[in-house]
């Protein structure tokens, strides 16, 4: 039901669960631990960083870490599947309208899946 991109984004966020700016993971370590192909994984890491849910630091001791622990699957969907740059504030009315439209599309898709 979910795209590989969204599945890999979820695995990356799960792998980064206990990270912070003092305890980062390299991109290689994240992708190895989550068993994600390098080419696709690097692009997803970049999208997640541009989307504001993870941070990256360059250099010898650099790597990636989660910006917040309060991230849900809908945030990932928004960042990875709608090609938007930043997750906006929940109070933003345009964001709420867009999320409603996406939610309705997902519900319509779910109606077509037989179980």
Residue ranges and their predicted role:
Residues 1-3, 101:
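Short amphipathic alpha-helical boundary/capping segments
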Residues 67-115:
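Non-DNA-binding regulatory cores of transcription-related proteins
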Residues 51-66:
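Beta-hairpin "wing" of winged helix-turn-helix
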Residues 27-30, 59-62, 89-95:
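Short linear capping/connector segments at secondary-structure termini
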Residues 4-10, 14-36:
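N-terminal helix-turn-helix DNA-binding core of bacterial DNA-binding proteins
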Residues 6-10, 42, 74:
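Non-catalytic, well-ordered alpha-helical scaffold segments
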Residues 35-50:
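Short amphipathic alpha-helical interaction segments
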